[in-house]
């Protein structure tokens, strides 16, 4: 019978859903979709990575995980490079990942998916609900690009995607009508993530409780949604990650 000590929420999740449907239509929707039509026009249907077995006619989704950890020196070096080039750590890691994929696949046109929090308004920052959307990041890794040139190219791609992140991924697939094939996912087959939440940085353990220790525990379901997923996070100043394949 006690009143809640929590402050009143400015909006509810249902309010956001209604607002999104009302806002994402007409000229606004057309402008957002127009960007993606142009950005993804002529994109390769599949990133052909070298594998020891032929791609099955239908995805089986069997997979495994490989964990890794970078040194503190390498982590700091990546941060310094990012600051020097005026890009984020996410952009630097994405550039390296796309360059590696280009080398292995021998394809200069590399498309990678990446989830985005999609909490672009202050009213929803503390609201419980699923706002995550998936962005399609396409970078041309052609020619003898210098590191700085590649980073600036990736930066431009990311900023354009962030500015047009309101279109739900499912709507984008429906609009673009990519070639559908049971052997691979549409638009991209490789994903990249960088977790930057307080929990991954270890901040959640500090001050939460002197008698409470919070840690990460690795799990593996034996499945893989995509051909490759590179998940990274920063824990106590060191980049760690895992590759799902």
Predicted regions located by residue number:
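Adenylate-forming
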Residues: 1-4, 8-27, 33-42, 50-57, ...
């Amino acid at each position: 019978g006690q009143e809640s000590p929590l402050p009143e929420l400015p909006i509810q999740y249902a309010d956001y859903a209604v607002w999104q449907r009302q806002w994402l239509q007409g000229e606004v929707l057309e402008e957002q979709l127009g960007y993606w039509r142009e950005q993804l026009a002529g994109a390769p249907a599949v990133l052909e990575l070298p594998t020891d077995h032929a791609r099955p006619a239908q995805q089986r989704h069997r997979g495994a995980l490989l964990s890794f950890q970078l040194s503190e020196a390498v982590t700091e070096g990546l941060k310094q490079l990012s600051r020097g080039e005026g890009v984020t750590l996410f952009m630097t890691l994405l550039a390296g990942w796309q360059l590696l994929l280009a080398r292995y696949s021998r394809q200069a046109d590399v498309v990678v998916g990446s989830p985005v929090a999609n909490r672009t308004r202050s009213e929803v920052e503390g609201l419980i609900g699923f706002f995550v959307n998936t962005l399609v990041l396409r970078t041309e890794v052609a020619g003898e690009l210098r590191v700085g040139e590649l980073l600036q190219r990736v930066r431009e791609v990311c900023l354009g995607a962030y500015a047009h992140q309101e279109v739900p991924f499912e709507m984008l697939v429906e609009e673009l009508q990519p070639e559908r094939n049971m052997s691979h996912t549409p638009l991209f087959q490789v994903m990249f993530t960088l977790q930057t939440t307080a929990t991954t940085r270890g901040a959640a353990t500090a001050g939460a409780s002197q008698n409470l220790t919070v840690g990460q525990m690795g799990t593996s379901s034996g499945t893989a949604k995509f051909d490759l997923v590179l998940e990274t996070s920063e824990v106590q100043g060191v980049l760690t990650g895992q590759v799902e394949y």
